[in-house]
Amino acid sequence: MRSNIRYALWVRAAALAAGMFLVPQAPRAQSAEQVHPYVSPWKTPWDYEGARGNDHWGDLDPAYAACKGKEQSPIDIRRTQKAALPALRFEYHTGPLQYVINNGHTIRVNYYAPGSGDFLVFGDERYQLTQFHFHRPSEEYVRGKRYDMVLHLMHETREGKVAGVAVLLKAGAANRAVQEIWDHMPATEGQNLVSALDLNPASMLPDDTADYYMYMGSVTAPPCTEGVTWFVLKTPITVSAEQISAFAKLYPHDVRPVQPLNGRIVKESK
């Protein structure tokens, strides 16, 4: 029991150190949106390519050692094991976004909702939504297929357990919620926008969330913390070609290559 608690605290500490799972704070009262400098949480800079790219992450900083681990993400979902998995329950509500951040690697939204907050419920576990961000193209492959983009909704329990929900995005009709975020995202790297926008993250979920893949993996950027439960929804949502292009102007390729499974089992809901 003590080792489990220590491990959970270690996962939480490592994730917090990288700014990937910030527990939301209530936003300041404000009459209009404000832009502030963004202070990077990464002590050692990294990138997706070149001398600081994925192949070198594990050597850039001792804090990034997990990037050389055996349970890394993303993966190519090919062989799966059918399982009677619990339904995913999304207890999402309309609430104010805390920050819309251009952090030099992606557009990330720190989410805050008053009251009980917004939760992903899986079995007996309740994971609170802390932030979401985007990648282009998708980091995940499904049987060799990559999608135009992916949305990662990141959640955490009080004990520090982390769960990510991957929503695959494909070109098609425009998504109103995504457009609202695009209309408020800072165009300049290193900007942190205090948002006056209210949003329900459920508006970025597909109508069908019953079918999904599940596996144990990691954060997909340094420090690559392992112990993350990933849920990859089978049904994609659509975004317009213009919305994809708008993101691509900032981040044309913010993806980590797929990582070896190393014997991990990918479960598929029946």
Where are these regions (language model features)?
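Bacterial N-terminal signal peptides
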Residues: 11-22
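Alpha-carbonic anhydrase
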Residues: 2-7, 27-270
